[in-house]
Amino acid sequence: QLDKTISANPHYASAHINRAMLQRMRIESSLQEGQNIFSAPSQEIEDLFHDLSRAIHLSLPASSPTAPVSEYAARMLRTAYSHRAYLYLKAVETETQLKGLGKSELEELASKDFASAARYGDEVAREMSVRTNPYAKMCGAIVRNALREEQKGEAARG
């Protein structure tokens, strides 16, 4: 049914998002033990990403990606970006390479998509953007190591 709607209204972003969500739910409900969403045929996964990317493209302002958008477009953008970021994180979680991208590249894509969703009003995505940001993780690791070394030094002196 959604295929017909999209064929008749190819510029309707919401239909692309709905089809992607339904497709993901259908895939996840049919998984066997030990499988993950990326166990589905690659064409189905590509279709998911295509629908989400198309919804983003249709919802962004033509003049500039940073131009103001309507409330409807903001809702479409935050939903599509969050959904795509979720898929990138699932790929990281399941150690799946997408289009030859490894864990760090996928985490970076997820972080960027979460940041984009946050820009359009998704507060959970804002938090996830910070959590998945590879640079923030690296800085956090450096600070933790420095604190650990400082504590070792104090313990040795004390």
Regions found by a protein language model. Name each.
Residues 20, 25-35, 85, 90-101, ...:
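Short coil/turn linking the two alpha-helices of tandem helical-hairpin repeats
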Residues 3-6, 56-64, 68-71, 118, ...:
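A conserved position within tetratricopeptide repeats
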Residues 17-18, 67-68, 75-82, 108, ...:
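Alpha-solenoid helical repeat scaffolds
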Residues 43-56, 102-126, 130-134, 140-150:
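TPR/TPR-like (Sel1-like) alpha-helical repeat modules
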Residues 8-13, 26, 59, 69, ...:
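Short helix-capping/linker turns of helical repeat alpha-solenoids
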Residues 12, 16-19, 48, 70, ...:
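Residues that mark the junctions of alpha-helical repeat units in TPR/alpha-solenoid scaffolds
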